[in-house]
Amino acid sequence: MSNLIKFYLSSTLWVVVNTFTAGAVLQTFLMENGFSEELTNIICSSGQVISIIAMLLFSPVADKIKEVIPVTARTYLLYFPLVILLLIVCLLGNFGWVLTVLLFLTIGLYSVAGGLQSSLTYKLPYMILDMRHYGRTTAICGILTGVMGLLISLVLTWLQNAWGYANAMTALFLLCLPLLFATYILIRTMRPIASAPAPAKKDAVKINYFRFKPFCQLIAANFLRGFGTGILNVVVTVGYYCKVLDADSAAIVVVISNFTTFMGSSLYSVITGRIPEKWILLITCIGMCVSTPIMLIGNSTLLFLIGYGLATTFWTVVNYSIPVATTQIADYTVMGQYSSGRLLLHTSGSGLAGFLCIRLIDLIGGLPTMILTGVCFLVCGISYFVYMKKNNLR
């Protein structure tokens, strides 16, 4: 089996696990099991803070790792404890104080894994894929994961209606265990391609972030994109808090999220290589700015879902375009460090947004909060466009 097939398969299996153990599904699960909206926000934001710490600690050695493939594969093993804990909660019927403590610990491990992967995610493709077609490859991968995500979200809705919420989640968490193991095996058995960069040296180039122009000139862009992403990451909590979502409509959010991932990936697969990345980023970030406020106009569930669908379609394109732009901005020899620094800014903004989201809504209202979210993405798009145009990047 080729690396490309393994890449597609592992990504598709991982989206199943990630859908059921993070984001909207995890937020709904916690709130359905007695956690308040604010505590749910704190738990999710704490995970982001842990990811930041993991990236901060791992960043100095990211470009010195010789065995990128096996190290990346092992990070997936850190996801098992959270899946097992969520399954136990389903079987017992409640958290209790012991399981609540364990929840924080397992989310911590989950977040450490995410932080480590963030440092390696832009080095792995160089080892296993033909980077000349990286944009198209990731877009096709996004289409596959989007289709899978849409299917499993429909299955989630059907199971909840047929079996009840608790039984449905028990079955799905149980399914996550073999899928997670298969993901690990697929990545672990990948082999470096002939054109893969040579193994890193112990004296690999070390960058000074505050003298490295790509990092410095895009600080605001990456931080504000993270802040906007942080609001969207807790969108179910926002919907619950603003009284426009319940468990049933939250399940629809998951369906929309996966459908728009498919739509955004399909759109990106068509335009990548034909339209310069700087223009893709600018146009889609303008789309984000326009669509995010729609979610909380009039406190309507229908408008919330329409706005969310539009926003996440543009968001998907942005999330695929920035990694491709990053391959133009930074050289492979410093890719791990630059990516760690960039994602550190992004995750810092995301974590801060998670902590402040409910407070912002209380302070300025739901609609102004979503307008602010859109403006964050607009600044990101303009900043990347100006930087890439100035440096003659495509």
Labelled PLM ranges:
Residues M1-I53, K213-V255:
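Helix-loop boundary and gating motifs at the non-cytosolic
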Residues V68, W158-L177, R359-F377:
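A membrane-interface helix-boundary motif in multi-pass transporters
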Residues M1, I193-A220:
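Juxtamembrane intracellular "pre-TM" segments in multi-pass secondary transporters
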Residues P70-L86, W279-I294, G374:
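Structural signature of the two symmetry-related core transmembrane helices
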Residues A54-E67, Q160, G264-E277, I361-D362:
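Helix-to-loop junctions at the C-terminal end of transmembrane segments
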Residues E37-E38, L129-C141, A247, A330-R342:
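Loop-to-transmembrane helix entry/capping segments in MFS-fold secondary transporters
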Residues W279-N319:
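C-terminal transmembrane helical hairpin of 12-TM major facilitator-type secondary transporters
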Residues G114-L129, V317-A330:
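Intracellular juxtamembrane helix-capping segments at the cytosolic ends
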